């Protein structure tokens, strides 16, 4: 350890206090701000007529991060007369009304006099770098997912639509050589069946990409059609309850709700190992709530998700487009509950 006498140490600390970019605020036992450095003026102007830390800080605070939310005021770090020493991430509004993230600490520095230090370090550059890295990572995954989807559609077209069309083409070519009327009728009926299968394949693919019933009739009709298709194609029974009936919502909201429910069911079908899913759509005073329940395998939310992880990520991203939220409750062996809430 460096040998620094008390005078030099006091001088160094004073210089640090005056020149650091770290915002430092000292508070007494009554919560009153007794001193702060110049850097703290970016958050609290000395022209403010504040008398207590909670008034001065709370007016500029946009919430702190906890295990439940990115920005929350629940169980505020300043809400107790004898706070524990703690470190956390907080969002503060600067004097020019820009919201910035900070690493904050709130610590008792003098037990006898009960003096506390509230410090803030701007972490905007780190957050921006992390976001850019995350965006690049998600862009790569999105591009990969798009390519996989294109491959899937290509296979669907080749294996079903193109094959059916080739069969029809062959049957039509043979038809002109038929002399017997009975065989002619039989071949014609077979071509009819092939054409019917072809139409169904194209319709299924079209519905999967974008159901016309969603635009024309709304969520209720689109869901009922989609659930019938799921039962026919995959043997999945969807127990459906709703109070929206023929109510129409904003087009963007309907699209988000439909896609989130679709993705949740797809995940259950692919990973949960179930043959039945419960879907409930309710309009309440708070907004539109969609709940998707499967009683399958469940998963550990702390582990890397199966597949690309874009399904869960996409649900959250879609919900945010309409100021909605997605909550996922899951336990291994007990299934998964996905709840989407959208203000309307």
Curated annotation (Swiss-Prot):
Taxonomy, superkingdom: Bacteria
Sequence ranges assigned to domain Histidine kinase in this UniProt record: 147-344
Alphabetical UniProt keywords: 4Fe-4S, ATP-binding, Cytoplasm, Iron, Iron-sulfur, Kinase, Metal-binding, Nucleotide-binding, Phosphoprotein, Transferase, Two-component regulatory system
Residue list for modification Phosphohistidine: 158
Post-translational modification: Autophosphorylated.
Names of the cofactor(s): [4Fe-4S] cluster
Broad EC category: transferase
Main location: cytoplasm
Record note on cofactor: Binds 1 [4Fe-4S] cluster.
Bilayer-crossing regions: none
Gene Ontology CC annotations of this record: cytoplasm; membrane
Pfam families to which the protein is assigned, alphabetical: HATPase_c, HisKA_3
EC identifiers of the protein: 2.7.13.3
Binding site for [4Fe-4S] cluster: 58, 61, 73, 76
InterPro entries: HATPase_C_sf, His_kinase_dom, Sensor_HK_TwoCompSys, Sig_transdc_His_kin-like_C, Sig_transdc_His_kin_sub3_dim/P, Sig_transdc_His_kinase_NreB
GO molecular function per UniProt: 4 iron, 4 sulfur cluster binding; ATP binding; iron ion binding; phosphorelay sensor kinase activity; protein dimerization activity
Name of this chain's protein: Oxygen sensor histidine kinase NreB
Organism: Staphylococcus haemolyticus (strain JCSC1435)
Lineage start: Bacteria, Bacillati, Bacillota, Bacilli, Bacillales
Gene that produces this protein: nreB
